[in-house]
């Protein structure tokens, strides 16, 4: 099973009593924070279970209200390997064998992977020929091409499910900004 997601509220409460250095030491991993969630679960592929995004009845529910961000609904996924894995890349998808499991029907079983850039704290992402595609800041990326991710980049799994990428420093700054 992949890493267990925590809620944004959990991190917000932790950040309240910490300096930036303490937070970054305690939470040393980059994160993916949910931006939107799927509302309609109809029209899934019978073979893979992936929700196919070719129907105008599909509804996107963007999380835009800060009160909704602070609720227990928003999930945060740490960008890290499962302890039992030997491969360095971080795999993301719907299947329980991934390092990060996104239980959303618009996400493919093996949707994308993150590659750590040697001697840096940066990552590249690669779409693994997903059914609905991967979008980086609204632009669809081609399967198997590497794309570097930066703080505040929006990753879309198809067009329905978005996550925002944060380094530990940027995540702390975002949390402190939510408190003010």
Regions found by a protein language model. Give the residues of each.
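Short hydrophobic/aromatic patches on the structural cores and recognition surfaces of FHA
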Residues: 92, 111-115, 124-126, 130-135, ...
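Short, well-ordered turn and helix-capping elements at secondary-structure junctions
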Residues: 96-98, 111, 140, 145
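General beta-strand recognition
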Residues: 91, 101, 122-124, 156
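Short, well-ordered strand-loop elements centered on a beta-strand within folded domains, enriched
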Residues: 30-31, 120-128
């Amino acid at each position: 099973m992949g890493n267990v997601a925590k809620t944004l509220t959990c991190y917000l409460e932790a950040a309240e009593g910490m300096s930036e250095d303490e937070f970054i030491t305690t939470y040393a991993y980059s994160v993916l924070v949910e931006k939107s969630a799927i509302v309609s679960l109809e029209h899934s592929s019978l073979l893979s279970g992936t929700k196919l995004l070719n129907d105008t009845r599909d509804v996107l529910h963007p999380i835009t209200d800060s009160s909704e961000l602070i609720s227990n609904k928003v999930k945060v996924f740490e960008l890290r390997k499962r302890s039992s894995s030997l491969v360095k890349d971080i795999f993301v998808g719907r299947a329980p064998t991934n390092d990060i499991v996104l239980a959303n029907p618009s996400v493919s079983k093996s949707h994308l992977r993150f590659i750590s850039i040697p001697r840096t704290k940066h990552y590249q992402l690669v779409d693994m020929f997903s059914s609905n595609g991967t979008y980086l800041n609204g632009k669809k990326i081609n399967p198997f091409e590497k794309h570097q991710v930066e703080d505040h980049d929006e990753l879309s799994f198809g067009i329905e499910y978005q996550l925002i990428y944060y380094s530990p420093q940027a995540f702390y700054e975002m949390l402190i900004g939510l408190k003010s």
